[in-house]
């Protein structure tokens, strides 16, 4: 991952949101969150065109009763053109909002 360490990026996802640029688009990772009413952890990733004001669509969403499971799925599910996060992170640039 350009502009940061992958381990730090992943650690941050457990406490906050993060963004990356990949293939010319901006992707906003909503960190692992907990829904008190439903007693579920959840996360999602939104795709934007050039900047945070040009929302395109949600590309990923996952819910679980377990925080670690939620993070594992976020990183290992194949929603990046049939690849998982670990397979494409080397082409991503960590960016500030």
Regions found by a protein language model. Name each.
Residues 1-22:
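Negatively charged, low-complexity tracts enriched in Asp/Glu with abundant Ser/Thr
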Residues 26-86:
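Acidic, low-complexity, intrinsically disordered interaction modules
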Residues 92-97:
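Short acidic DE-rich linear segments
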């Amino acid at each position: 991952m350009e502009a940061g360490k992958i381990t730090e990026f992943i650690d941050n996802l457990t406490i906050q949101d993060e963004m990356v640029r990949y293939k010319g688009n901006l992707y906003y990772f909503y960190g692992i969150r907990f829904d008190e009413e439903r007693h579920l952890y959840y996360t999602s990733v939104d795709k934007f065109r050039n900047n945070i004001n040009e929302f395109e669509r949600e590309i990923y969403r996952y819910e679980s009763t377990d925080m670690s499971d939620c993070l594992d799925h976020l990183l290992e599910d194949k929603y990046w053109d049939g690849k998982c996060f670990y397979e494409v992170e080397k082409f991503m640039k960590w960016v500030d909002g």
